[in-house]
A protein has these predicted regions:
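A structured, charge-rich N-terminal accessory region that forms the first stable segment of a protein
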Residues: 1-65
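A short alpha->loop->secondary-structure connector
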Residues: 20, 99-114
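Short, conserved secondary-structure transition motifs
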Residues: 116-141
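A conserved mid-domain beta-alpha-beta active-site/ligand-binding segment of alpha/beta enzyme cores
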Residues: 136-216
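Charge-enriched amphipathic alpha-helical scaffolds
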Residues: 209, 230-264
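Short acidic, hydrophobic short linear motifs in intrinsically disordered regions
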Residues: 219-230, 239
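Accessory beta->alpha helical hairpin/"wing" motif in late/C-terminal subdomains of nucleic-acid enzymes
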Residues: 241-244, 256-329
């Protein structure tokens, strides 16, 4: 049996709980950086390795090695009678789930059975964020509740990944208009993804706007800002590294929206001491008086969409909850 977990914490707890089989930690961050469709596998993973290297100050050779070993371990699924996917409801997890469903949908499973554990709450935990909160007994109690992955789930997961990795994000909107019941948390997660596109109001995506609002409200130190962001935007499931990437983007360009002090590497003991201060441009953007993209340009991947230049090709219309052609704004 092979268990695929979305984090080291959950995998460690699962091992201590003596769940039968081997445990593979899925360490990708497919919610961030390029995931273009139509790219050969080797090129795709090289692209991902370069992104992870740039984003998290890693050696590109190390990132490439880790991703290669992860894919090689995944390819050994045929040696197991059952593969159990352990995921959660948030965008971070749902993207990894649909990638894996798409991956398995393209392969002959033979005698291997696919199972899924995917939850958004747990009895007795009021503020449930993820499987990493569970102790050994709690995690073990989920194992008998796993359900066989159906052909409908494989098909929907494959279709969802193809939409996410497309250069045309309207494919996601088309998917959300269909029945997504086989994956009950998918619709909410992908809607949150669409809200990451630059808004008509000020050029900020929802994640950026929420983070900047929290800083403006006095959450200047990262040790206060990060938990406040998690409480404000739990459906994204972003860790500290992903939130820092968003903040760094806001601090760049000819007219930065914030200034940063004491920003140390994320594995440093001093990391939580980083502080942020909103600038006058940041205040103007929050008020809707200025536009972040027009002030600073954009070079950002959202799934398979590469937004670049002095205008965003796609914008999010908050009032109508839909994407629009940014070149017509």
């Amino acid at each position: 049996m092979l268990h695929i977990h979305n984090g080291d914490s959950t995998a460690g707890t699962a091992r201590k709980a003596d769940l039968p089989g081997e445990h593979l930690v899925w360490r990708e961050v497919l919610a961030c950086g390029p995931t273009p469709s139509g790219v050969p596998d080797d090129d795709f993973w090289q692209l991902r390795a370069r992104h992870l290297s740039d984003a998290y100050a890693l050696r590109v050779e190390d990132s490439a090695k880790d991703l290669r070993e992860q894919q090689e371990a995944l390819a050994q699924f045929v040696d197991h009678e059952e593969v159990v996917l352990w995921f959660e409801h948030d965008l971070f997890c749902q993207l990894h789930l649909i990638y894996l469903l798409n991956w398995f949908a393209q392969r002959e499973l033979g005698k291997t059975k696919l199972s899924l554990i995917c939850i958004d709450n747990f009895p007795g935990i009021e503020d449930f964020r993820g499987l990493g909160q569970l102790n050994e007994a709690q995690l073990a109690s989920l194992f008998p509740q796993r359900r066989a992955i159906s052909s409908a789930q494989l098909n929907l997961g494959s279709k969802a990944w193809q939409a996410y990795s497309s250069s045309d994000p309207s494919q996601i909107e088309n998917l959300l208009a269909e029945d997504t019941a086989p994956l009950p948390f998918l619709k909410s997660a992908l809607f949150k993804h669409l809200e990451r596109f630059p808004s008509l109001n000020n050029g900020l995506g929802r994640v950026e706007n929420s983070a900047l609002e929290l800083i403006a409200a006095g959450n200047n130190e990262f040790k206060k800002l990060f938990p406040a962001f998690g409480k404000c935007e739990p459906t994204y499931g972003f860790g500290d590294a992903q939130v820092v990437l968003e903040l760094k983007r806001l601090g760049k360009g000819p007219h930065p929206l914030l200034t940063m002090k004491n920003l140390s590497p994320i594995d440093s003991d001093k990391f939580l001491s980083a502080s942020f201060q909103i600038t006058d441009h940041g205040k103007a953007v929050l008020n809707g008086d200025e536009d972040f993209v027009r002030l600073n340009g954009i070079d950002m991947w959202l799934g398979g969409v590469h937004l670049q230049g002095n205008e965003a090709a796609w914008r999010w219309d908050e009032d109508r909850s839909k994407l629009i052609d940014g070149t017509l704004v």
